[in-house]
Each structure stands twice: as C-alpha cells, then as structure tokens.
C-alpha cells in the first residue's frame, strides 16, 4: 500500500522547468547544429505529482509468510492471494492515522461472489480512512487471469433497473467493490481503448493508462519500464496493468487536493469522475465513467457535490 500526501505549492519564483537528472546529451559532428537544451531541462520522467510526499507501507511480500498458515479461514493465504484482507485493513488504518490524504492500493484480492469471505474488518478500515480521516482511497480494479480475478458481465439489457449489473457479478475485486469509499481504476492502452486484461465490474469508477509505463528502479533509482527476468532465458516484461493505472489516478488526486484543499475526499473523487472522458454508453464496467483527464480535473467548473458518500454520515 502506498500513500500520497498532497504536494506543497511551488516557490513563487519557480519556473516551469523541471529539474535535470543529468547533463545534456553531447553533440556529435554529424548532428545538426542546434542549441543544446538549457540547464535544468527535463529528462522525460517527471510523474503525475512530482512534489508529492510518498509513504510506502508493505502489507505483503514474497520474502515473508505467516507463521503456521492455515487454509481454513476466509482470510487464509490459499484463498486470498494478495497478502490478507486483514493486513490490507491494518495498512489502510496505519496510513490514515499517519495523515495520508491519498491512499493508493495497487493490490487486489479476488474472490468468488458466492463466497467472498468475511470482509467486515477491511470495510470498517476503508470507512474509517475515507470518512473519519478524510483520505481519498484509490485501488486497482484488478487484472483478468491473475490470482483468481476474472471479468464480470458488462450489462444486462433485461434488467434496466441495475445498469451496472451488480446482480450478475461472479468475482468480487477487493477493496474495489467497496465503491462508496474507494475509487476503483481500470486500465487503457496507449490509444485510450480499454485494456482486454483490465478486470470489469460495477465498482470501476474511472480508467487511466495501464501500458507504456515508466517508473523508478528500487535499485539505484534510475528510470525503468519493465520487470527484469525472473528465470534464466526469460525476457524483460513491460509494466502493464491496473496497479499502474491506480497509481496514475492517485497522483491526480494529490494534485486535486493541493488545488482544492477545501474539498472532502468524496468530493475529490467526484471531481475526478465528473471530468473524465466518458465511454460511448456514458458509463460501463470496464472503464467506469471514462478516462481520467488531469487538466480537466484541475480546471473545470464542477459542483462540489455531497461531502460524504450516501449513508456514511449515519455511521460516524
């Protein structure tokens, strides 16, 4: 679980140039004689909210495992693939208590809708963070085919009273399905089309880029765009998926919180959703209300809306 705090405002005398991460490229004799880039020219890796403060909280790891794990309980490692639901809940509460105003959850636990297990602890943690601590919670919708995740039906024309098709859900994506408190993010490709592997479900709120992702390596901090091979003979695997889409939207949420500090977490989510580029049907279970538009989220004239999710106030 990663948490993102709103970025501080830039100094008044700061220019629009991003800081340089290295010297300009040298010019060779057969290159055209053009002026070199000025000092401080960007290197192309800036990020959505480069001034945000990031707190990294590890709630699951391949390097560790529970002591004497049991597969009998609903939150067992055999049934819940991404850590445990309880460890996610503890991480969310810890992040909220540390003062994080945006919480990114780029992990997904997929369970059969007929047997979703006991998720009351996680639900209470999400309610606490979103309602009591006023944190924007952004989660990955999930990737079809990974750890029990699978696509749900898009729409049932025989039941217009249920436009998001909740009654036909076969696999729940947690924490995304707690959609009153969580903004679930699907993935699009480089052309803005829904990524085939992006898990569909009625909880998906918006979508963001999920391919051609650049990031920073945990070893050395240099730019990377793929996972290294895990076995001899394998090739690098480019970054893709809804985990990266969720991180993208978390950065947008940090910018919105910095620009509009008076908005509640629920109102920040409303601004991101209302400014998205809608799919042809207006909303669907793959893209939600559409592709996120950071500039529109920061500049459009959008009514603030309700301060809390419907019914949340009664539980405060």
Protein language model features and the residues they cover:
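Subtilisin-like serine protease catalytic core
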Residues: 1-81, 181, 200-203, 258-271, ...
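Substrate-binding/specificity loop regions of serine endopeptidase catalytic domains
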Residues: 109-205, 212-246
């Amino acid at each position: 679980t990663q948490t993102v705090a709103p970025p501080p405002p830039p100094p008044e005398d700061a220019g629009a140039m991003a800081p340089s991460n290295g010297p300009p490229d040298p010019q060779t004799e057969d290159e055209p004689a053009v002026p070199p880039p000025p000092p401080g020219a960007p290197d192309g890796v800036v990020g959505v909210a480069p001034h945000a403060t990031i707190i990294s909280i590890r709630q699951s790891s391949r390097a560790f495992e529970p002591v004497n794990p049991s597969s009998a309980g609903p939150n067992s490692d055999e049934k819940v693939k991404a850590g445990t639901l309880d460890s996610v809940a503890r991480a969310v509460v810890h992040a909220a208590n540390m003062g994080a105003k945006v919480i990114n959850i780029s992990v997904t636990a997929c369970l059969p809708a007929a047997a979703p297990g006991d998720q009351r602890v996680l639900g209470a943690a999400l309610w606490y963070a979103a309602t009591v601590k006023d944190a924007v919670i952004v989660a990955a919708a999930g990737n079809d085919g990974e750890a029990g995740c699978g696509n749900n039906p898009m729409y049932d024309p025989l039941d217009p009273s249920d436009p998001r098709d909740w009654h036909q859900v076969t696999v729940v994506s947690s924490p995304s399905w707690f959609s009153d408190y969580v903004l679930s993010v699907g993935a699009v490709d480089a052309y803005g089309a829904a990524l085939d592997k992006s898990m569909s479900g009625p909880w998906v709120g918006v979508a963001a880029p999920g391919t051609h992702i650049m990031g920073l390596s945990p070893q050395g901090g240099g730019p990377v765009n793929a996972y290294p091979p895990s076995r001899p003979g394998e090739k690098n695997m480019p970054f893709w998926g809804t985990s990266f889409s969720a991180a993208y939207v978390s950065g947008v949420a940090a910018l919105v919180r910095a620009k509009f500090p008076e908005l509640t977490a629920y109102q920040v989510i409303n601004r991101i959703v209302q400014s998205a580029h809608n799919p042809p049907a207006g909303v669907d279970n793959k893209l939600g209300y559409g592709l996120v538009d950071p500039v529109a989220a920061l500049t459009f004239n959008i009514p603030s809306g309700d301060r809390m999710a419907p019914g949340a106030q009664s539980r405060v």
